Amino acid sequence: MKKINPNNTESWKMLQNHFYEIKSFHIKELFKKDKNRFKKFSLKFDNRILVDYSKNRITSFTIKLLLKLANEMDLNNSIKSMFSGKIINETENRAVLHTALRNRSNSSIIHNGCNIMFDINKVLEKMKHFSNLVINRKWLGYTGKYITDIVNIGIGGSDLGPKMVIKALNSYRNHLNIHFVSNVDGANIFNVLKKLNPESTLFIIVSKTFTTQETIVNANTAKKWMLNAVNKNEFLDQHFIAVTTNAQEAMNFGIRYKNIFLFWDWVGGRFSLWSSVGLSIVLAVGFKNFEQLLDGAYMMDQHYLHTKFDNNIPVLLALIGVWYNNFFKSETEAIFFYDWNMNYFSSFLQQMNMESNGKNICRSGEFVNWQTGPIIWGEPGTNGQHAFYQLLHQGTKLIPSDFIISIIPKHPFKDHHKYLLSHFFAQTQALAFGKFNQKCNVHINDKKTFDERLSSISFHKVCKGNQPSNSIVLDQLNPYNLGILIALYEHKVFTQGVIFNIFSFDQWGVELGKLLAKEIFLNMNTTGSKNYEYDSSTNGLINFYKIHSNNT
């Protein structure tokens, strides 16, 4: 990948000038000037998904300049480099090949001289066989009872992706109960274990290195809990599975090789749900539905790889995001999924985006002097409307938003869904167009007081609008469409990383926190108050802990 600073490109300078020209334009005026604006700025994917980006503060010339920026930043070759397995994660000397995990054409993908599709298919077949045993009640616990509860122990990408997908596909769930333990806070695992019977519980320990502190602490607690019931280590075989790249560490923990599901160092954690990390997904919804998830992602991969940028959905959404982030200085981006089962989606995208593009060093190894990844946040509709939409409608911040919904619900209450859709359509309209001539119902007898009161309240009811949004409408939320949607956002994040000239697939900030926590943990276990080699604040916090923990 080329190392090009975006603000040195001709298109960046042109975009800056263009921004000054149109920054005061109102979305409602853009619609008035162009009766075909929706048609011009919307795309359909596979006749299943509509992406409407017409309610943005853009013109055709804006898109033209953004596409010019993508070309100047060598985006096309960067995409090809990722898909072909070149070392684009340079700081860790790794390829980035999560797309290979859903390569449904099964065409050869060569990495380090080997066709990795052989290993991918082998693991998929193992996942299929194992999940069939568990789902069909043929995998039995130490007393001969069939498994009723699965506990996925992992954090970050080993937790958020599978948890999001399983909740999203709630209507496809089988009889198995799936639980997630991620936080090292003991309350997390305590609240899960107290509901379970060890005779019918299966633990899946998910860790890329099998050394992640939070995961291993929780795994050891689960192991002790199980041993209290079974008393014999050999009985653990029926109750512990590992998903990792480090088989040796998993075996050191006590998990036999036959119970280990491998993945590879070219799979980043936040992009790993397509691998054996998705074993809990397979157990929850069955292997056929997992294949549909892969199929959908593969279709979006092909769209991203082969479609010209002016019709390329991930590229266009990414570039529009850059437009707000780097020229309007918007800083945040909201995700509003109007589906209760998608309540983990914004958290999932938060990790995908902020861990990938929350960087201040460019690919040349210098500090950037432009904005990189935005702050991602969100809440399912309509709850958010009664929490923070007020700020969107009448606050002082520019907050671009993605609104997502499906047409056909997965529940029988059709009237509920019509109400939900009406809110969805209304909010994007209100945010874009606002309301300037408010009517006010005030019941006051005195005419003069009434007129004064009416004028005062009407002014407070003004909503200026001009808040941009994209609308993504699915025909229905099924595994195939969910695969499309997740892959769309993955490629959006990568595209923005290319434009920002950063490495999107490392996370050295996360690693720093891990190292410091290990060191501080050792100091917490020493006796007496001390002045450790930290700042006075950290020393004071540790010593306050010691004083009060000794009093309990």
Curated annotation (Swiss-Prot):
Pathway membership, UniProt: Carbohydrate biosynthesis; gluconeogenesis; Carbohydrate degradation; glycolysis; D-glyceraldehyde 3-phosphate and glycerone phosphate from D-glucose: step 2/4
Alphabetical GO biological process terms: gluconeogenesis; glucose 6-phosphate metabolic process; glycolytic process
EC number annotated for this UniProt entry: 5.3.1.9
One example GO MF annotation: glucose-6-phosphate isomerase activity
Enzyme class: isomerase
Pfam family, one: PGI
Catalytic activity, as annotated: alpha-D-glucose 6-phosphate = beta-D-fructose 6-phosphate
Organism domain of life: Bacteria
Annotated compartments: Cytoplasm
Residues annotated as catalytic: 355 (proton donor), 386, 514
Keywords associated with the record: Cytoplasm, Gluconeogenesis, Glycolysis, Isomerase
GO CC term (a single one): cytosol
HAMAP family: G6P_isomerase
Function as written in the Swiss-Prot or TrEMBL entry: Catalyzes the reversible isomerization of glucose-6-phosphate to fructose-6-phosphate.
PANTHER family recorded: GLUCOSE-6-PHOSPHATE ISOMERASE
Family, as annotated: Belongs to the GPI family.
Protein name stated in the entry: Glucose-6-phosphate isomerase
Lineage: Bacteria, Pseudomonadati, Pseudomonadota, Gammaproteobacteria, Enterobacterales
